[in-house]
């Protein structure tokens, strides 16, 4: 990630992973990485599996999301599902509402939840894809 960030001229998307601030695993991003991705205008996709969030439930996922928001800002955090069958997630796509509900129950404003649940990723795609 350091090499990518050193040469990035457009928003960097970390499609799926975790953050060391809530789950100190080798693959997860440091606070410095979070800030540097945000500085590119990019998005950090928070994953749903144990190695990414150190848990197998919506609470661990939301803790990682909230931590990333606290470091990178709400405009730079999104979902990183990785629903490809390789990882074990606590739910399938029908369970995404659980993330929304948990963010709401913790007092996050609806406009911020909308950004995390897809708005930030759409913003980057619109900025970066041809014809946008």
Feature roles, as predicted:
Residues 1-13, 26-41, 59-75:
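Histidine/acidic residue-rich metal-binding segments in metalloenzymes
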Residues 4, 78-80, 114-118:
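Beta-strand segments within the central parallel beta-sheet cores of soluble alpha/beta enzyme folds
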Residues 16, 44, 82, 113, ...:
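Conserved, mostly hydrophobic/aromatic
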Residues 18-28, 51-62:
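Active-site glycine- and acidic-residue-rich loops that bind
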Residues 38-53:
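A conserved active-site cap/scaffold subdomain adjacent to cofactor or substrate pockets
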Residues 48, 72-93:
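Short acidic/histidine-rich active-site segments
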